[in-house]
Amino acid sequence: MQALVEAIRERGMILPGGMLKVDGLINHQLLPQLTREMGERFAAGFAPLNPNKVVTIEVSGIAPALATALALNVPLVYARKKKPITMQEPTFTAQSISRTKGGAVDLFVSSEYLGSGDRVVVIDDFLASGGTLRALAGIIALSGAELLGLGCVIEKGFEEGRAKLADLGVPILTLANILRMNEQEGIVVEAGLQDLPKQPAG
């Protein structure tokens, strides 16, 4: 997605510890037109798989996931990082390691909104080591829903998260791929990668 690639080159910053700062695009400030285009790209890729639900994690995944759900005209469910007292039992729970939070994060989804019969696409902001996506995949498996594919706005290709998630057996679509980032070269980014099937599932 060329508009996203250019925005990362213009606005992205490398922080200590190998962190990529793009909070002017997706994590703090949102650019509506860019976000809408993200959703349209994800929807175009995953529509042939006939999803009936989009799943993400709060907070940064919500904007691109909502844009995708709007384009697909399906509900969006986002995993909560704290279990509210209003969440009905049973709940599906998994744990993820958050680099930005500096530790483990528990994720919760109510069985009221995810279950057997749901055909799910997961949308998130980053694909790095793949831990968060694997946690969401675990929640989907616990619910009895079917995971159709994974979509991420930005992939850190050098962290090899895509390969680590290969055992899930689902297609992965990303919109921008960070090849490397360092003080000498800055952020080296290209259009994202996809391994979507050419024909609808089944």
From Swiss-Prot:
Q: Is Transferase there in the keyword field? A: yes
Compartments, as annotated in UniProt: Cytoplasm
Kindly list the positions annotated as binding 5-phospho-alpha-D-ribose 1-diphosphate: A128, S129, G130, G131, T132
Any one of the GO BP annotations: XMP salvage
Report the Gene3D superfamilies cross-referenced here.
3.40.50.2020
| Catalytic reactions of this protein | XMP + diphosphate = xanthine + 5-phospho-alpha-D-ribose 1-diphosphate
Record InterPro entries: PRibTrfase_dom, PRTase-like, Pur/Pyrimidine_PRTase, Xanthine_PRibTrfase
Q: Which domain of life is it from?
A: Bacteria
Tell me the GO molecular function terms: xanthine phosphoribosyltransferase activity
Record-listed xanthine binding positions: L20, N27, K156
Keywords (alphabetical) are: Cytoplasm, Glycosyltransferase, Purine salvage, Transferase
GO cellular component terms, alphabetically, are: cytoplasm
Q: Which family does it belong to?
A: Belongs to the purine/pyrimidine phosphoribosyltransferase family. Xpt subfamily.
Q: Which NCBIfam families match?
A: PRK09219.1, XPRTase
Q: Quote the subunit structure annotation.
A: Homodimer.
Cited PANTHER family:
HYPOXANTHINE/GUANINE PHOSPHORIBOSYLTRANSFERASE (PTHR43864), XANTHINE PHOSPHORIBOSYLTRANSFERASE (PTHR43864:SF1)
Q: What function is annotated for this protein?
A: Converts the preformed base xanthine, a product of nucleic acid breakdown, to xanthosine 5'-monophosphate (XMP), so it can be reused for RNA or DNA synthesis.
Q: What is this protein called?
A: Xanthine phosphoribosyltransferase
Species in which this protein is naturally found? Deinococcus geothermalis (strain DSM 11300 / CIP 105573 / AG-3a)
